């Protein structure tokens, strides 16, 4: 937010405060100041000149020789290459020895044999950005107003002697995204009440808005407030110099005396407005509704936009004429032929505006304010002030009345707090008189009874809703630098790691030893990504004042963040990736507007590419399901939970491959999943085949693992038997291992799967799985009869339970 010191001085008295002092004071009261700039700094000897004579250069087809009055006895000859130079205009002249933008020094010289005593300048040569220069002067020099005095410094005529204070406004302080909002803030700091000199609205009582337009809002959730004023008999022209100066200093290009007023009101009130050419609407009906998937709109930038049902549009009853809150339509644009203006003021659904803005990549000052919040109490006032200004600057007449489609009931919030609570939080000893003065400076009405305050919050401060907000306001205006500093008190105890911290460090060391790298992703994400890879049902927890839609919802999984990291690396040709992350996810089962979410500590893995790169003696080995499952098994082993963990194939996670995904169970309860990211999901993230896992680390750590039991190595030999099974391809290894383990007897020591085969020889839907079973008796040598009995029981159980064929 750029704030003009001169403009601000019209509302609060800053005669005894320098711009830098003001910036410093604002910084210590809670609004960050990025810097203070004075446009004229670094420029010198640049004056007003009047072109008295202009003739073509004899040796050039694009240069002109000008005789310029710069307030001296004799005219000064200057050679100029601008296509729009002519006699009779007031111009910007850089004298010999002057400095223009870029610290460039201007010297007296010759151009094609003709003497040139300086330079006639464009706005760009004074440091203005191309984006703010009026289009009429984009390719040439700038014309100053005729009342400018020849030979005097040019800076006051362009308000380049103003100080521009750049503020960094956080999302919760969107009220400061307007000059009025900043004026209230500065007024509170210096104990002043801002005085606004709004122009008086004069209406033509003989004509009524009902003769021109009616407004209908299809769904008040989309547009809680919507109104139209009509200004007739306008004449489109350039805006006066003061208005152009203010817009250019705020980084906005002047267009004409109607559009410029809407931009001025945006800066003044923080209220976006839009002006339609009434004749081009070709209808007396304005309908605000959702677009259909078959509709298109050519916006003011000349682009054809394919609309969707997510978009709110302004229509003439039939076809769209504007993309609500984002950009108007070219079919209703203000032009030189416009004589009647339909002026729109509204509140639009911020979520819809954010989505539309993102969909079309159209970020604007208007859409940003709709997203962050607008003072609902001044929608009508902003429209009235704009109508009065348009009538004055364009010689028009405001038709009486306002066409209203929807209105919002403005409520003043009530917040209770006690003096004791304020002092307790801030560590202060403020008395009632001091706190009263602060509330009065802020413009907050209040009632106090023995230190108990009931405070009425004006609508312009919609960010204040709870006790903590009030305490923060007291701290800001009292001054953070005045809060007392105290040393920590209480007993000190020796620090130690909790079990969870100790286990987390163990696991990080384990995973890094396996070649993975730790990633740290944002806890805030989009609503769509927050709902991916979920292990249980939950509502989303949305921020009230998000910085952007990409960081608006608390995550409910870690994997989506890791996939963003994978995509970032893959885009930079880093193709072999193994990431892990330990972090919190947030589940909400209650009302997210009233209750905090439940936090769970999770661990996630994401692997893609090769685990082994090809060299002269090794073949490349790609990451697969068993790579990531092996890491999960290593984690479980460190936790001492191997015997309590089981896996079961699942198709319940839509973002995961239905044939390569498994739930992870801890004693029958889901604690995670492992598998391949669904190809469709991988394509959406623009990543190759990727394998992931996510575990509820908090739940795993909470389980008491069994103690480690050590036993001596048997002095009697172990016996191994192999068994090959022909089974249906749907039968899992885990099912077979469990059946073998349950029936092989007490001497079974180990089961090892050493071969899996599928092919045409086995028949469709079949696979061969070969196991090695190791038996040990620690007290005696095993004999064949014992082993044979165990193998017979195993074979019988496998045949009965899984219909296997023992090969």
Swiss-Prot record:
Q: Where is the FDX-ACB domain?
A: 714-807
Instruction: Please give the SMART domains that the UniProt record associates with this protein.
Output: B3_4 (SM00873), B5 (SM00874), FDX-ACB (SM00896)
Q: How is the cofactor bound?
A: Binds 2 magnesium ions per tetramer.
Instruction: Name the GO cellular-component terms.
Output: phenylalanine-tRNA ligase complex
Q: What is its EC number?
A: 6.1.1.20
Look at the named UniProt entry and state the broad enzyme category this protein falls under: ligase
Q: Which reaction does it catalyse?
A: tRNA(Phe) + L-phenylalanine + ATP = L-phenylalanyl-tRNA(Phe) + AMP + diphosphate + H(+)
GO MF annotation, one: tRNA binding
Q: Which domain of life is it from?
A: Bacteria
Record flagged with keyword Transferase: no
This protein's assembly is summarised as:
Tetramer of two alpha and two beta subunits.
Family label: Belongs to the phenylalanyl-tRNA synthetase beta subunit family. Type 1 subfamily.
> Can you name this protein?
Phenylalanine--tRNA ligase beta subunit
**Lineage, top ranks:** Bacteria, Bacillati, Bacillota, Bacilli, Lactobacillales
């Amino acid at each position: 937010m750029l704030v003009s010191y001169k403009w601000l001085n019209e509302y609060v008295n800053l005669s005894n405060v320098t711009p830098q002092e003001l910036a410093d004071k604002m910084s210590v009261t809670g609004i960050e100041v990025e810097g203070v700039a004075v446009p004229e700094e670094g420029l010198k000897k640049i004056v007003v000149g009047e072109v008295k004579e202009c003739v073509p250069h004899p040796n050039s087809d694009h240069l002109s020789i000008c005789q310029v009055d710069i307030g001296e006895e004799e005219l000064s000859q200057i050679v100029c290459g601008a296509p729009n130079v002519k006699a009779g205009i007031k111009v910007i002249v850089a004298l010999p020895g002057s400095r223009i933008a870029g610290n460039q020094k201007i010297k007296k010289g010759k151009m094609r044999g003709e003497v040139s005593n300086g330079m006639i300048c464009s706005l760009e040569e004074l440091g203005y950005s191309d984006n703010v220069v009026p289009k009429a002067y984009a390719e040439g020099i700038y014309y100053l107003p005729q009342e400018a005095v020849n030979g005097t410094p040019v800076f006051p005529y362009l308000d380049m002697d103003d100080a521009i204070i750049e503020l960094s406004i956080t999302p919760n302080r969107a009220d400061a995204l307007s000059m009025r909002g900043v004026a209230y803030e500065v007024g509170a700091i210096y104990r002043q009440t801002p005085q606004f000199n709004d122009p008086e609205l004069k209406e033509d009582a003989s004509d009524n808005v009902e003769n021109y337009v009616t407004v209908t809002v299809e769904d008040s959730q989309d547009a809680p407030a919507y109104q139209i004023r009509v200004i007739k008999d306008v004449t489109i022209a350039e805006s006066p110099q003061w208005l152009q100066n203010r817009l250019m200093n705020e980084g906005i290009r002047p267009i004409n005396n109607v559009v410029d007023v809407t931009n001025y009101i945006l800066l003044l009130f923080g209220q976006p407005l839009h002006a339609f050419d009434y004749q081009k609407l070709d209808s007396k009906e304005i309908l605000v509704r959702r677009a259909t998937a078959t509709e298109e709109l050519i916006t003011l930038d000349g682009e054809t936009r394919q609309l969707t049902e997510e978009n709110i549009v302004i229509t003439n009853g039939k076809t769209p004429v504007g993309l609500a809150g984002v950009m108007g339509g070219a079919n209703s644009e203000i032009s030189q032929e416009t004589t009647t203006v339909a002026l729109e003021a509204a509140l639009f659904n911020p979520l819809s505006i954010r989505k539309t803005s993102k969909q079309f990549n159209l970020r604007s000052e208007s859409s940003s304010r709709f997203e962050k919040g607008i003072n609902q109490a001044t929608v009508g006032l902003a429209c009235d002030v704009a109508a009065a200004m348009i009538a004055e600057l364009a010689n028009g007449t405001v038709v009486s009345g306002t066409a209203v489609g929807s209105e919002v009931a403005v409520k003043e919030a009530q917040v209770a707090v006690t003096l004791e609570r304020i002092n307790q939080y801030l560590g202060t000893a403020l008395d009632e008189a001091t706190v009263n003065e602060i509330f009065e400076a802020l413009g907050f009405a209040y009632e106090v009874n023995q230190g108990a305050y009931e405070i009425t919050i004006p609508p312009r401060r919609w960010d204040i809703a709870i006790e903590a907000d009030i305490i923060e306001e007291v701290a800001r205006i009292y001054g953070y630098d005045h809060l007392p500093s105290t040393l920590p008190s209480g007993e000190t105890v020796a620090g130690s790691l909790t079990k969870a911290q100790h286990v987390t460090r163990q696991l990080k060391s384990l995973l890094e030893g396996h070649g993975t790298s730790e990633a740290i992703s944002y806890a805030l994400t989009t609503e769509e990504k927050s709902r991916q890879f979920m292990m249980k049902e939950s509502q989303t927890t949305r921020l009230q004042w998000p910085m952007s839609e990409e960081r608006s919802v608390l995550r409910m999984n870690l994997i989506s963040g890791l996939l963003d990291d994978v995509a970032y690396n893959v885009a930079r040709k880093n193709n072999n990736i193994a990431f892990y992350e330990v972090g919190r996810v947030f589940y909400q089962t209650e009302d997210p507007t009233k209750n905090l979410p439940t936090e769970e500590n999770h661990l996630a893995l994401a692997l893609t590419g090769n685990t082994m790169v090809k060299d002269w003696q090794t073949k490349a080995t790609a990451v697969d399901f068993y790579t990531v499952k092996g890491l999960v098994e290593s984690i479980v082993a460190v936790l001492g939970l191997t015997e309590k963990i089981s896996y079961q194939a699942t198709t319940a996670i839509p973002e995961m491959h239905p044939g390569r995904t498994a739930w992870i169970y801890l004693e029958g309860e889901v604690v995670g999943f492992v598998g391949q990211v669904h190809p469709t999901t991988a394509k959406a993230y623009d990543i190759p085949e990727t394998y992931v896992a996510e575990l509820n680390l908090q739940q795993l750590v909470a389980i008491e693992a069994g103690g480690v039991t050590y036993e001596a190595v048997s002095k009697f030999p172990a016996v191994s038997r192999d068994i090959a099974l022909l089974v249906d391809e749907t039968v899992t290894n885990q099912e077979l291992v469990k059946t073998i383990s349950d029936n092989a007897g007490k001497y079974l020591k180990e089961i090892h799967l050493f071969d899996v085969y599928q092919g045409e020889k086995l028949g469709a839907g079949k696979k061969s799985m070969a196991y090695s079973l190791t038996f040990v008796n620690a007290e005696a040598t095993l004999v064949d009869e014992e082993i044979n009995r165990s193998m017979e029981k195993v074979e019988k159980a496998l045949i009965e339970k899984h219909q296997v064929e023992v090969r």
